[in-house]
Every structure is written in C-alpha cells, then in structure tokens.
Amino acid sequence: HLDSTDHYLNKNKSNNTDKRSVDEYTLRDIIGPIVYINISARVAKELARNGGKPSPDTKVTNFGTSTGATVLASDIENVAANIVDRAWIVVHSGWDKLFVGKGPKNPFMHPYINGLNYPGFGKDAVTKLIEIENRKGVRINGIVMDNLSIDSGESGRGSDGKNPYGDGWYTHQLG
C-alpha cells in the first residue's frame, strides 16, 4: 500500500506540503534506498491467539500498540542508522495473505480490514520517524506496507476508539 501525498493532506495538521497525486510522480520520486522492517512474526503470534484468523474484536486479536503486534517506535529506532534522504520504509506484516476472496456485505468486516483492527503505524511510530528525519536532516520518500493502510487500524479508530476518520490516521496527519 502506498498513499499519494495529496491523499495525506486530508488533515490540516500534516507536515507534508506536497500536493501531487500519484500520477504526477516521477521515477526519481518513487525510487530510493530501502529500509526494511519485518513485523510478521509478531503479527502471526497475535493471529495465533485466534487460530490464525483476525477478529475485529480487540479482546480476541489486537493489532494495537499495547500488544506489540504493529509497527512500534522501537522498530523505527532500530533502523534509524539506515534512514537516509529519499529512503523508503518498507514494512512486511504478513497481512497481505488475508486479502483473498469476496468479503461480506459490510466491507469493514472483511478479514483484510477486520473492523479497523490491523497492524500499521500508530502515533508513536510516526512521531519517532519524524524525529529521526528532523535529527538527521533527511526526508524519506515514503512508506510502503503489505496492508490496507500504512496507518494501523487502531490509529484509524481515533483516540476515543470509536471515531473512524476522526483524530487518528497519524501518517496522514503528521506525514
């Protein structure tokens, strides 16, 4: 999954001033060094709690920051030395294997979307990435993830846990 920068500007707090859509990107915009983060073992461990299947009920499977089954600030810190100008952060969560078949009538209940309960970047991870960019004086080209979104489902639910499209979606807001 890759979001265009004009998509990031759906929030007024965004640090990103680039308003281009993906069709306006040049080859230089979409190539660069890769910084690889693999969280698939942690995601698989969380899925194993429910026989390898995700549940939209966070009491059954939880891909939020508190469980570690998502991208954490420590993951970003662990690759900080590799973050250079124009780098791409590429995250493997293993979630792509859930994108199969036709889903239910309510698309939010498809296992891939899982009622906004899936791994991705939360506020702490995004904040750490921006901190490293600022400290090093670099700007990454972007984030790519094998998922519905680069933001975690927890992030999408907002700080109150009930507010989709509210104050969450931290990569979109802070990007």
Regions found by a protein language model. Name each.
Residues 2-175:
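Active-/binding-site microenvironments in catalytic and ligand-binding cores
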